[in-house]
């Protein structure tokens, strides 16, 4: 009954209004508030501040600065397996596996369209049909910056407007097409393993999504918008393996896609496996 009421509330709540309010709270600079709230949050979720570049909770200008905190340079060593594809974020594997018949597995009884996830452009989605996906959920206690699984050159970014359902096991099992309905930012890269997509999916009270090349991604009118980076006079944007790609200001999920016969997921990983940025996510399929 509790789960059913929770799901009903997800459809009734004003997602974007709540997220804007959460964003205002998270950016509050009043020392008495931001210090108390940050201390409560760090204790409630057992955040490990020993690995943070700035360990003093009171040194952050607001809660969002704490939430998107940088780590010490040696906190996340990169896996040295030849050709390793790295975990892009701290968190847990929600699901991973093949993209079958254009669908990505969400939870028992549910899948979602890879085409819709990527914004609805068949040409953009075609290289990933029959490929592989990994969905990684970032919990409140996790480090909330997302990094490159593999070195790549940015080709395209697509902002896809949508709802902001909460993302957790309950919603994954009960909200159809969850990740293809929530607001998201799709980042397309050319890599040595062919096209790679990293999709940053928003959720309830996720105030914003940022990328290192565009900053805050919030197009006017919240309409679907495509940004091309492989044409015109602008210099190519190349990011090395392990480099920061973007960050969540509160919450959610990163989904990584590769084309067919390009990668094989690490045998140690499965649904529910904990991940740390820089650890082995996959190895290349040998030609």
Curated annotation (Swiss-Prot):
The enzyme's E.C. designation: 4.1.1.65
Residues of the active site: 90, 147, 252
Listed GO biological process terms: phosphatidylethanolamine biosynthetic process
Keyword Membrane tagged: yes
MF annotations from Gene Ontology: phosphatidylserine decarboxylase activity
Record's keyword terms, sorted: Cell membrane, Decarboxylase, Lipid biosynthesis, Lipid metabolism, Lyase, Membrane, Phospholipid biosynthesis, Phospholipid metabolism, Pyruvate, Zymogen
InterPro entries given in the database record: PS_Dcarbxylase, PSD-B, PSD_type1_pro
Cofactor: pyruvate
Record note on cofactor: Binds 1 pyruvoyl group covalently per subunit.
Site positions per UniProt: Cleavage (non-hydrolytic): 251-252
Modified sites of kind Pyruvic acid (Ser): 252
Catalytic activity: a 1,2-diacyl-sn-glycero-3-phospho-L-serine + H(+) = a 1,2-diacyl-sn-glycero-3-phosphoethanolamine + CO2
The organism's place on the tree of life at top rank: Bacteria
Subunit structure as annotated in this protein's UniProt entry: Heterodimer of a large membrane-associated beta subunit and a small pyruvoyl-containing alpha subunit.
Family per record: Belongs to the phosphatidylserine decarboxylase family. PSD-B subfamily. Prokaryotic type I sub-subfamily.
Primary role: Catalyzes the formation of phosphatidylethanolamine (PtdEtn) from phosphatidylserine (PtdSer).
Identification of the protein by name: Phosphatidylserine decarboxylase proenzyme
């Amino acid at each position: 009954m509790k789960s059913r009421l929770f799901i009903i509330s997800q459809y009734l709540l004003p997602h974007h209004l709540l997220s804007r309010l959460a964003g205002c709270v998270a950016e509050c600079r009043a020392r008495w508030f931001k210090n108390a709230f940050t201390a409560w949050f760090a204790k409630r979720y057992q955040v490990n501040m020993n690995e943070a570049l700035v360990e003093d909770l009171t040194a952050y200008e607001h809660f969002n600065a704490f939430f998107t905190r940088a780590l010490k340079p040696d906190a996340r060593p990169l896996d040295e397996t030849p050709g390793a594809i790295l975990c892009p974020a701290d968190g847990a594997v929600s699901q991973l596996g093949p993209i079958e018949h254009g669908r990505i597995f969400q939870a028992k009884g549910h899948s979602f369209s890879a085409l819709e996830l990527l914004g609805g452009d068949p040409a953009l989605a075609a290289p990933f049909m029959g490929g592989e996906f990994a969905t990684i959920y970032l919990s409140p206690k996790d480090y909330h910056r997302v990094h490159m699984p593999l070195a790549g050159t940015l080709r395209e970014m697509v902002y896809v407007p949508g709802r902001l359902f909460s993302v957790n096991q309950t919603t994954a099992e009960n909200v159809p097409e969850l990740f293809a309905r929530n607001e998201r930012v799709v980042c397309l890269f050319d890599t040595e393993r062919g096209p790679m997509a990293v999709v940053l999916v928003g959720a309830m009270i996720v105030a914003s999504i940022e990328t290192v090349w565009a900053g805050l991604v919030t197009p006017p009118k919240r309409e679907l918008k495509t940004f091309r980076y492989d044409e015109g006079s602008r210099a190519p944007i190349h990011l090395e393996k392990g480099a920061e790609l973007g960050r969540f200001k509160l919450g959610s999920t990163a989904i990584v896609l590769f084309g067919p016969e390009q990668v094989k997921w690490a045998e140690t990983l499965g649904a529910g496996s904990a991940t740390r940025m820089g650890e082995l996510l996959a190895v290349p399929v040998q030609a």
